[in-house]
Design a protein with these regions (language model features):
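Conserved beta-strand-loop surface patch within small alpha/beta domains used
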Residues: 1-136, 143-246
Length: 246
């Protein structure tokens, strides 16, 4: 029996080189090491390591998320409304949702998939087909908890999908944080990467932070490259270990 190789390791010779691995692939590019994966609804590339010294014979890689069809912003707005109605501010409990794409119509739909709920956690109905095939897995967080938790990292391992948290859902300024996960490698992304429009009444935390970082770099002026080079130097020390372990 011919057993397919689920994980592939390769060099990137063209920027449009197709993703062929059934599970995921590790790619050495001109500018770093990347993990790439694809499924029916999307393909994604996450940077694992940036090279301080480029490899001119190879093509440059770039982190990205591309959906076959972007998720309507209204889906996230509906989930927020449902989350607000299912719990009140005084007795908050987390809730979990799966966003899926219908294989026949191509339309997106969402479903609540919590098996149990408490103030600081929610457990999924992992036998639910919506949870198993979700493009986006998103859950609510207690007020003020604006980062993915260590428990989130554990729960979201071993999957290739989008992940999200909704925070401060009963406040005047509810917020959302999104990321893509490729089998234990995560990259936070702004909502505009995956939605057809900015979700109304939701602060995009990743976009907000990126804009703030751009402002800081602009304020640094000529000193900004020194900070960037220092970060590249720090990252360069781990380049060899990534390559040796491929």
């Amino acid at each position: 029996m011919n057993i397919p190789q689920l994980v592939e390791r390769k060099f990137l010779f063209a920027s449009d080189q197709p993703i062929t691995a059934p599970l995921y692939e590790i790619v050495i590019a001109q500018n770093g090491v990347f993990k790439r994966a694809r499924r029916r609804e999307m393909q994604a590339v996450v940077e694992l390591s940036a090279f301080a010294v480029k490899i001119p014979e190879l093509a440059a890689g770039e982190a990205r998320v591309e959906l076959t069809e972007k998720i309507p912003a209204s889906v996230l707005e509906e989930i927020l409304a449902h989350a607000r109605s299912e719990t009140d501010a005084a007795n908050f409990t987390e809730n979990l949702y799966a966003v899926c794409r219908d294989t026949e119509t191509g339309n997106y739909f969402w479903k609540e998939v919590s098996r149990s709920r408490s103030f600081g956690s929610t457990i999924a109905c992992d036998d639910d087909s919506a949870y198993q095939t979700a493009v986006l897995e998103i859950h609510t967080h207690p007020p003020g908890c604006r980062e993915f938790s260590n428990q989130d990292d554990c729960d979201e391992r071993g999957k290739f999908r989008l992940f999200g948290i909704l925070v401060d859902i009963h406040s005047d300024n509810p917020a959302i944080r999104l990321r893509v996960g490729i089998y234990d490698s995560f990259w936070e992304i702004p909502a505009e990467f995956i939605t057809d429009a900015p979700p109304e009444n939701l602060t995009d935390l990743v976009k907000q932070e990126k804009e703030r970082l751009a402002e800081i770099c602009n304020d640094l002026g000529d000193d900004a490259p020194e900070y960037i080079l220092a970060e590249e130097y720090r990252a360069a020390t781990v380049n060899l270990s990534y390559v040796e372990n491929l």
